[in-house]
């Protein structure tokens, strides 16, 4: 699945201004962060789908920062809170209006600046939500309504983003987990990107976070959401797409991945959002790759779902898992070779291993000729191999002979 910065949004007669705005929004959202393009993608998909998201992973991976930036770039009303086991409803939904209670006997909350009036929200440690909070939160997520005394308020909430270290086991939390359509396992920045991360971090420490002007309005986002529903409507008549989608759902279930009927239906909405996200008003089989953010129930499912979809739709992106393994081996070799003394006998075996990896990379590049993401990763890994070769040459004149 390609990222928006690599997509040209076109429609008959010229460019589409709204989709150009969406591309600008995505680029501005991901720009300050190192290796957080995928998280930005999930945020955009969630907003386009008018659905909610769970980020799973350890603290300190910029989850709340990138969501806050999304709200800022949209000039959206934003609410943020870290939940614990003792969080009271007042903290999320507003304190009781004592005046209303005294004068009218109505149990009403003062909701200004609280979750019911937010357009984008982030709840950290969401599964700390207790029983007193759960029912109200579920109504807000599912129906976008908040009962406030004798008044039913329609919440403007577009998407709620949340974070947790783990997936909940408790039965009472499963309904909440199910309401979060998008699920993404956030990993720390890879070793190859650490220098960039440090530089960016130092820049923030010295100059602070620079706030950018909004690049898109909520009203424009809602118009693009209408396009998602238009694509979803068209998909009803796409027998080829529905047949392939049904096959995927069957395979997921056969592989032991639990997919409820409701999640399967919602998954089609995510697929339609991905088509719009990539500048199309129709679904293609490659849009099914978005299911890696929708179908997983456990941590182990994330890799499994991506592999199943890649294999079934024959996408070049099935090579991404292979590239991750090759990258780990390359970085291991670089680390071990740096420690070698000159003329060490292991240089020959390392050279041969490096050559095998290089051949595998070039084979992947030939087979995935149309996948820019794969080709870019191959190119970067080949550059690292080139650097390692230079290091080997400096350690032993035998290197060239043994390749």
Which residues does each PLM region occupy?
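Pre-Walker A (pre-P-loop) alpha-helix and adjacent loop at the N terminus of AAA/AAA+ ATPase modules
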Residues: 16-58
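Post-Walker A helix-loop "phosphate-sensing" segment adjacent to the P-loop in P-loop NTPases
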Residues: 72-81, 98-101, 143-145
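Canonical AAA+ ATPase core
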Residues: 99-104, 120-136, 141-217, 228-231, ...
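Walker A/P-loop
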Residues: 44-85
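C-terminal engagement/docking regions of AAA+ P-loop ATPases
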Residues: 7-9, 254, 258, 276-403
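Conserved NTP-binding/hydrolysis module of P-loop NTPases
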Residues: 84-104
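Basic, amphipathic alpha-helical bundle interface domains used for macromolecular binding and assembly
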Residues: 205-303
